[in-house]
Amino acid sequence: MSDYEFTLRFQLQDENDNPENYLDLLFEAGCDDALVGVGSLGSISLNFTREALTASAAVTSAIQNVLSAIPSAILIELAPDLMNTTEIADIISDRFQKLTRQAVRKYATGQIARAKTRFPPAAISGSQPLWHLGEVLDWMVINEKISKPSVISKVNRLVETTQTIKIFNTAIQQNTDVPDDLLAAAKEIIISQTIHR
């Protein structure tokens, strides 16, 4: 079993609902492995470090735990997924190894020539482009920007988590449930990508 780190953001039924009212219920429902953000009325965020066999199992069990405590809550976002260059540099520096925003920007704009493959395209372009974190982490490993075996195993867990999150966020944006066959396909992709690293 491994630890998977992710954040779930929920909208509460009443926009004036105080999220502090749900702290005990969340703890009793099995969310004792989460830091709960209660700063805004009408919404609640939970930052999980959940032990599970797979990222999919960690995320789905966390969602089920929250919904058992707050059945009327609506899942609106999972993170980490879309990030700008600063956020990418921060998460890599915090969890794996030192990396500057300038380095990520240079990778993204092709200013660093020593790369086996092109940097992944931005998922959202514009003045502040956003990338899927999992795609950037994959690129960093393939291009040996992250190369220590002990770090790569941690990166692979985060990539698995972000791929699962991407599927859930897509379903949320399309206002659909995550179909069982999609989850099964995602698990196969995750497993095959992990084997090929």
Tell me the role of every PLM-derived stretch.
Residues 1-14:
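Short glycine-/aliphatic-rich beta-strand segments at the starts of folded cytosolic domains
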Residues 14-21, 54-59:
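Short, conserved charged micro-motifs
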Residues 19-43:
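A short, structured beta-strand/loop element
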Residues 53-60, 84-101:
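Short, low-order "capping/linker" segments at domain edges
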Residues 95-130:
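Major-groove DNA-recognition helix of helix-turn-helix-type DNA-binding domains
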Residues 133-191:
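A short, Lys/Arg-enriched interface patch at domain edges and termini
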